[in-house]
């Protein structure tokens, strides 16, 4: 294996492992986040299932964590065998999977961020009150979980770039092609 291929494979492995860790951390932080307040003898509990966007984030992060863990195993096995390049159909499958994971998680982050802003700031036009003034611990832990999910999403975008490079290098120039000077 060439040095550049080893470095790229190592970078991909580290990114995929970090995706698994950050996505799992986000999942744990969000799912375990609850806070109970007593309002005039009525118990009100804030939990992640109250906002559908956050449920979407939990599902997306669970899928991403498992997918990245499986791809990390594939990277380790490929590195041990010394095989870097794949067949075109397999490279297309990895590229498509990486793209799907990146888009899924970016969409989940965007939806959850909007819900978070509404929970923090409220919406006067719709008479929605600020929830985070009442459930401070809940909102803080949720913000940390969403930040972890954001880091996982950023790593997924970089993995998608590496995956695209690995795919399109299979379509590189051949020796039979004529080059035109510019």
Swiss-Prot record:
Superkingdom, natural source: Eukaryota
Cellular location(s): Cell membrane
Cellular component annotations (GO), alphabetically ordered: plasma membrane
Major localisation: membrane
Descriptive protein name: CASP-like protein 2B1
Keyword list, A-Z: Cell membrane, Membrane, Transmembrane, Transmembrane helix
Membrane topology label: Multi-pass membrane protein
Transmembrane parts of this sequence: 13-31, 53-73, 90-110, 142-162
Extracellular side: 32-52, 111-141
Family: Belongs to the Casparian strip membrane proteins (CASP) family.
NCBIfam families associated with the record: A_tha_TIGR01569
Cited InterPro entries: CASP/CASPL (IPR006459), CASP_dom (IPR006702)
Positions in the Cytoplasmic compartment: 1-12, 74-89, 163-182
Subunit organization: Homodimer and heterodimers.
């Amino acid at each position: 294996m060439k040095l550049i291929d080893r470095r790229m494979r190592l970078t991909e492995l580290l990114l995929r492992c970090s995706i698994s860790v950050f996505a799992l951390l986000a999942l744990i932080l969000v799912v375990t986040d609850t806070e109970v307040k007593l309002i005039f003898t009525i118990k009100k509990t804030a939990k992640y299932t109250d906002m559908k966007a956050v449920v979407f984030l939990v599902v997306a992060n669970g899928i991403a964590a498992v997918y990245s863990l499986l791809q990390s195993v594939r990277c380790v096995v490929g590195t041990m065998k010394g095989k870097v390049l794949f067949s075109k159909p397999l490279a297309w499958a990895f590229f498509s999977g990486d793209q799907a994971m990146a888009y899924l998680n970016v969409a989940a982050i965007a939806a959850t961020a909007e819900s978070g802003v509404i929970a923090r700031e409220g919406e006067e036009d719709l008479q929605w009150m600020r929830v985070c003034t009442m459930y401070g611990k809940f909102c803080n832990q949720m913000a940390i979980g969403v930040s972890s999910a954001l880091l996982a999403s950023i790593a997924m975008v970089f993995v998608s770039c590496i995956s695209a490079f690995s795919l399109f290098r299979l379509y590189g120039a051949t020796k039979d092609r004529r080059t035109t000077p510019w």
